[in-house]
Amino acid sequence: MAPFTNAAPDAEPILDFHQHTRYATSSQRRSDQQLVAHQIYNGVTKSVLLAGEGWMLSQLGDNASCAALERDYPGQFVRFACADPAESRAVDVLRGNVSRGAIGLGELKFPVAVDSPEMHRIYKLAEERGVPVLLHFQYETYNTGFERFEDVLKAYPKVNFVGHAQSWWGNISADLNPLDMYPKGPVRRGGLTDRLLQDYPNIYGDLSAGSGLNAITRDPEFAGGFIERHSRKLIWASDCNCLDGKGGGTSDGYCIATRSLAALRKLVPNEDVFRRIVHENGARLLDGHAK
């Protein structure tokens, strides 16, 4: 995978598996130039651009904006495609984008059940085209019915899925209150997410955003064992919308990418395992597709 053109020649590769064009902050939309600078600041050498469609366009850029950025910065970005599964043209939109260079489907963040007929159409396309699918799980809001997601994994063993967001990471604990988007305190062993990662070779975990950061910081003792168990299934990603790598433009005042990389480095002293999570696992999912 080609590095950012202005990264240090000897820089260790870091793949950010979750970024967006025109990402809305608390004050403005981030420009392409700000995104590129943000990634360089965090040492990222390649990024996966996840498109939005439908309601998501109020927060981030569409398929066309991702394609344009990939074209304008060769070697620095690859892109996934998005479409609203409720629209009759969804599969055609996705298929067309894949034929024009998209190498995955996502971010899929829509108010449908994860096992709905609309989503099955998308999974079948992913199976047909051999591309991964990234899903945002949020209780009673997006890709609902997480407890039934196991049946999807069974039905599409050749499709690589990537789980993301609050209900995905909250379910590392067996005692999750599903209404609690960012649970704190000790994790109770036996959570559904932990088991799915253990039992199914076709599911991976996207460590991005506040939900991913919370998952690896709320209970450091659990997190150490969790990362050790799933070191070949976890993918570093940021989903960070700050303007400058220092928290600019955000209500929280910090950069998720910077903070999550630091937390991961603290939890993973083994350099080989760290490299696996920040580059190799994600690169393996993109293998054969990334330019």
Model regions and ranges:
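H/E-rich (His + Asp/Glu) clusters that bind or coordinate divalent metals
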Residues: 5, 169-171, 175-291
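Active-site gating/metal-coordination segments in enzymes
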Residues: 46, 54, 60-147, 204, ...
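An N-terminally biased module of ancient metal coordination in phosphate/nucleic-acid-related enzymes
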Residues: 1-64
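Residue-level marker for buried hydrophobic side chains located in beta-strands
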Residues: 13-15, 133, 161, 236
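Helix C-cap/helix->beta junction micro-motif
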Residues: 73, 128-129, 156-157, 199-200, ...
